[in-house]
Regions:
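Switch/connector loops and helix/strand junctions flanking conserved nucleotide-binding motifs
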Residues: 1-3, 33-38, 55-59, 203-205, ...
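Conserved P-loop NTPase architecture
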Residues: 1-146
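Flexible beta-alpha connector loops of hexameric P-loop NTPases
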Residues: 2-3, 61-65, 106, 168-170, ...
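Conserved C-terminal guanine-recognition region of P-loop GTPase G domains, centered on the G4
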Residues: 9-19, 23-46, 189-193, 214-286
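Short, acidic/turn-prone active-site loops that include or flank metal/cofactor-
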Residues: 51-55, 175-176, 289-292
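C-terminal-of-GTPase-core extension/linker across diverse P-loop GTPases
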Residues: 77, 81-155, 161-162, 166, ...
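Switch I (effector-binding) loop of TRAFAC-class P-loop GTPase G-domains
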Residues: 130-132, 136-145, 163-195, 203-216, ...
Length: 324
């Protein structure tokens, strides 16, 4: 309970850390504040758990105002119960009328400041949520259906968005490159058009702090008429990643929304592996967003799945990219 590991494994961990000259130890799981402190004392190294690692990655990726607010909110919620201190700075500060009374400890002051900062960020995120709700309402009045790209992180959602709409959204081969939802209009040859939304990538056992902080972003999925589930066909844990995304969508009560499974990065597979995946996922669409292979079949599938309303009252501003 105190160290997660038994004495033997703890000794083995210390030896491995010495041999590898490691200054940081990461546990693939969530540790309690007491366990983090105990492990840091025993190993004399910085210890991170899985949630803190994901939050650190998010902090590096956040560039927009909304993204930074959401990451800061998640970090504060994670940090709040883990505030500890044992030095003279934690002595009670003078407080009360005329300097009498116990006052607050520094620890209590830090916790109060965190609570105040969380309340302020919540207010700002509520403002962003209202702005996005207004945008969604305007799209609904125009009769534009919405298709949202969902999937495990680094599955190629942003690359697919760029390929379909000829945009230049940031798309990199790394985890959580996209934090904020990006929307683009997509016009089909039959004069139909829809809004295509790119969202933050999922990960198995998504930390609850992230789910709460990114609620404003994930609301884009709730307004979607179609979910395009993009999966990395070349990843060795494809099945687990698809199951993780399905589980998160089920938790968000989005099972009723029509969904298309897309096996991206098909060009990286050998013929034998392609046959295996076709048998395992017969309804999935194999594509390569990078080489644009399979995009015609995807566009036809989207057109057949979306319930198109009359486009007579849709106001079209400027030339729109087409799907070829």
């Amino acid at each position: 309970p105190r160290h997660i590991l038994g004495k033997g494994k703890l000794t083995e961990l210390e030896i491995l850390a010495l041999q590898g000259q490691a200054s940081l130890i990461i546990f693939d799981g969530e540790l309690t504040p007491a366990q983090l402190n105990s492990l840091s004392e025993v190993t004399e190294r910085k210890v991170l758990d899985r949630t803190q690692l994901i939050l650190d990655i998010f902090a590096q990726r956040a560039t927009t105002r909304a993204g930074k607010l959401q990451v800061e909110m998640a970090q504060l919620k994670y940090t709040q119960p883990r505030l500890v201190g044992k030095n003279r700075a934690m002595d009670r500060l003078m407080g009360g009328i005329g300097g009498r009374g116990p006052g607050e400890t520094k620890l209590e002051t830090d916790r109060r400041r965190i609570r105040e900062r969380i309340a302020k960020i919540k207010k700002e995120l509520d403002g962003l949520r209202q702005q996005r709700a207004f945008t969604r309402a305007r799209r609904a009045r125009q009769g534009l259906p919405v298709a949202a790209l969902v999937g495990y992180t680094n599955a190629g959602k942003s690359t697919l968005l760029n390929a379909l709409t000829r945009s230049e959204v940031l798309a990199e081969d790394k985890l959580f490159a996209t934090l904020d939802p990006t929307t683009r209009r997509l016009r089909f040859p039959e004069e139909h058009e829809l809004v295509l939304a790119d969202t933050v990538g999922f990960i198995r056992n998504l930390p609850k702090e992230l789910t709460e902080a990114f609620q404003a972003t994930l609301e884009e999925l709730e307004a979607a008429d179609l979910l395009l589930h993009v999966a990395d066909a070349s990843h060795p844990e494809l099945d687990r990643q698809i199951a993780a995304v399905d589980g998160i969508l089920a938790d968000m009560e989005l099972n009723e929304v029509p969904r298309i499974l897309i096996l991206n990065k098909w060009d990286r597979l050998e013929d034998e592996m392609r046959d295996i995946l076709r048998d395992r996922w017969p309804d999935a669409l194999p594509i390569s967003a990078e080489t644009r292979d399979g995009l015609n079949a995807l566009s036809r599938c989207i057109e057949n799945t979306i319930h198109w309303e009359t486009t007579a009252n849709i106001e079209i501003t400027g030339p729109m990219p087409k799907v070829y």
